[in-house]
Amino acid sequence: MSTKKVKEAEAVSEEVTQQSKLAEAKRALSGVKMALKKKLGDDIFTEKVIGILPSISTGSALIDKEIGNNGLVLGRVHEIFGNTGSAKTTLATLTMINALKQYPDKFVLYMDFEQAFNLEYSRRLGLDPDDERFIFMQPSSIEDGFEIVDRMVSTGILSLVVMDSVPAMISRREMEADYDKETMAEKPRVLSRSIPKLLEPLKEANTALVFINQIRDKLSY
């Protein structure tokens, strides 16, 4: 047998071996899937999503292009961050305006932890503060804020939630105790507990959650 035919035979043999291994792997995967579906439910394996996902425009074509999907994807958590005075709240306001336009049957929830939201400035940008679909709240603590978000997201009536801002948030424990390293660490703990709990409800309700944050030179709140 010529060298060429030997190589062809080896290639065919290798392909057959690979196909056999793949078939074996598929059988193993099928068995695992059946067991997981039986224990965790059929929804544990979701369909692959290809293409543009439902989103909300930020009002900036450049930012939307960089993000992809024409803006902030519904059902996910996003963060707008930057230095002081870098138009973070302005960008969030433009996003709220577009959410009201793109999803007229849904509400937008804005949580003003800083207690500094300028209603007149937002009006000049094009947001109607008197629109009944625009919900404006000023929670006193992080825990109150997340409880509000959890309850309202579960209704399925929101397209967008904006929490402004992370540095201005304060936990109940911080409100009641003296400022020290232990109480300062309470905010990150509350955030790390609360955000994961919202991931599935946000996905089911098709609601985008936006946190506004600030770049700091020191790792403190």
Regions found by a protein language model. Give the residues of each.
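N-terminal acidic, proline/glycine-rich, low-complexity intrinsically disordered segments
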Residues: M1-V12
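The Walker A/P-loop phosphate-binding site
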Residues: T17-E132, I148-S154
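A conditional alpha-helix N-cap/helix-loop micro-motif detector
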Residues: I56-S60, T89, I142, M184, ...
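Loop/turn-to-beta-strand initiation segments
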Residues: D105-F107, E132, I157-L160, E204-F211
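Short acidic loop-to-helix transition motifs that present clustered carboxylates
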Residues: Q115-A116, S140-G145, D217
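A glycine-rich helix N-cap at a beta->alpha junction
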Residues: D130-E143
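Short amphipathic alpha-helices and their capping/turn segments at secondary-structure boundaries
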Residues: G145-V161, L198-L199
